[in-house]
Amino acid sequence: MSILDKFSLKGHVAIVTGAGRGIGRAIALAYAEAGANVVCAARTLDAVEKVATEAKAFGVDALGVSCDVSDEAQLDALVARTLSVFGRITLLVNNAGGAAPNNPLHTSADSFDAAFHFNVTSAFSLSAKVAPHMLKAGGGSIVNISSSASRYSQKYFSAYGTAKAALNQMTRLLAADFAPQIRVNGIAPGAIMTDALAPYLDEEGTAKMLALTPMNTMGMPEDIAITALYLASPAARWVTGKILEVDGGAESSTWPY
């Protein structure tokens, strides 16, 4: 097998959550370009159907499925739909997640729990649901999308940062549970220029963020997609339980506020 062949995903079936835009969309398209059939899942059906259409341009099969990952029944339906169409599941990307910056003095326990459920519990549930099918298929790979907020001290991220830190540790623990047949890894992106980040950045905020980033540029969704492709591919066959930091070299918070 050539070096380039080790990055091929031909014969694989992938579920990517949060695939309607940003990082999730970029990962879904990268997996499709590498040869995988892709199920694009997100709450907005129109968005994921559009991404699925883009994925098909690479000569693979793709499907858009409406799914709120916080809803257990919808996760079951997502897995069932994937199996009914493709017959197997070998790759999963738990990308859906997020939470707005929060002032802990004005954050209810319910809001904190909701952030944890959205970012951690949903990823655990979907991983547990697909793992038996990966084992039946002979193995698989799970990639969890975390955040640099999981390791930096920064203001107003006590809900999101705590949840992503928990996701990191869950990644390590599931890697031990599922080895050697299923590899489980994570990616901790830094500042990625997406629709989710853009509303928080004005010209001054962007300049501060760039100044705090050694590479002096914002990351793009494709930077994370390339990393996710590596982790899913045979090229990473000996990598599990790891969190790859893709953050422009930042070793402290780049949040400008």
Predicted regions: what is each one?
Residues V13, G20-G22:
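Conserved glycine-rich cofactor-binding loop
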Residues S127, A163, T171:
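Active-site helix of classical SDR
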Residues P132, A175-P180, R237:
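Alpha-helical segment proximal to the catalytic Tyr-Lys
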Residues S147:
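Residue(s) in the substrate-gating loop at a strand-loop-helix junction
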